[in-house]
Amino acid sequence: MSVGLLIITHGDIGRSLLDTAVVVMGTCPLQTETLGIPMASDPDQQLERAQQYLQQLEQGDGVLILTDLYGSTPSNIASKLRNDKVAVITGLNLPMLIRVLNYPTLTLHELAEKATGGGREGIIPFMPDAPT
């Protein structure tokens, strides 16, 4: 068994990131589902869909949910699903997702930490020299 991965984002952002990560890695080693939330959708209906995905993905080791924007509808849906077998990380980016997919044998807690680190480490500013 391994941790399941549920990606909840605005529109097709999650699907696009997952497709790109699979091309980069050549595989998707975790059981993964994406849920794209349309802009004008009913959050309660989307919560039901997310719960269905969660049931499919939970195989005993937990589920990691990645969302794109803290405080948004996808993030709010994910926060309602959080429990002792479900971890939620916001701020999804491609480096975070690739990091998660690179460690399919980690525990839920370890994978959540890898996700957070991968997301942070993937942000590298290239700033112009400060004016003198």
Model segments located where?
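N-terminal loops that bind phosphate or other acidic moieties
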Residues: 2-64, 69-132
